[in-house]
Amino acid sequence: MQVSVTLLGLLFTVAACSIHVLSQPDAVNAPLTCCYSFTGKMIPMSRLENYKRITSSRCPKEAVVFVTKLKREICADPNKEWVQKYIRKLDQNQVRSETTVFYKIASTLRTSAPLNVNLTHKSEANASTLFSTTTSSTSVEVTSMTEN
């Protein structure tokens, strides 16, 4: 009898812990990228495609992770001057790229869209913006796009 009470208590404890763990949001259990060391060399800017900042309290260090065109991730010290310079350049390139995409979409639709008052073209781009054309009543709603 005493063994069954102990076993029942143990089973109840395991069930209570399982419910607590399973009720956690997925973001908490998601894999986390942390940097434990930084690159000692400057990376050639021409090899970089993007970056992300690591600021999680679950990581031992704040870091910048540069993503190369070959999809390799390299940890860098966010306090280094060359890292800050590369971040500014990548941010400028991203803005330039988005502006070019918006311009191409707007100019293409201005020249090739049929004249139809109720026509709305949905294209993919990186912000939610409404462009009105000057040659017709056509409007273009640009929603989100990611460039690879």
Swiss-Prot record:
The gene is Ccl2. Residues 1-23 form the signal peptide. It is found in: Secreted. One of its GO terms (molecular function) is chemokine activity. Glycans are attached at N126. Its main location: secreted. SUPFAM superfamilies: Interleukin 8-like chemokines. Disulfide bonds join C34-C59, C35-C75. Keywords: Chemotaxis, Cytokine, Disulfide bond, Glycoprotein, Inflammatory response, Pyrrolidone carboxylic acid, Secreted, Signal. PANTHER family: C-C MOTIF CHEMOKINE 2, SMALL INDUCIBLE CYTOKINE A. This is C-C motif chemokine 2. The modification Pyrrolidone carboxylic acid is found at Q24. InterPro entries: Chemokine_b/g/d, Chemokine_CC_CS, Chemokine_IL8-like_dom, Interleukin_8-like_sf. GO terms for cellular component: axon terminus; C-fiber; dendrite; endocytic vesicle; extracellular region; extracellular space; neuronal cell body; perikaryon. Transmembrane segments: none annotated. Induction: In pancreatic islets, secretion is stimulated by IL1B. In islets from Zucker diabetic fatty (ZDF) rats, but not lean animals, secretion is also increased by endocannabinoid anandamide/AEA. It comes from the Eukaryota.
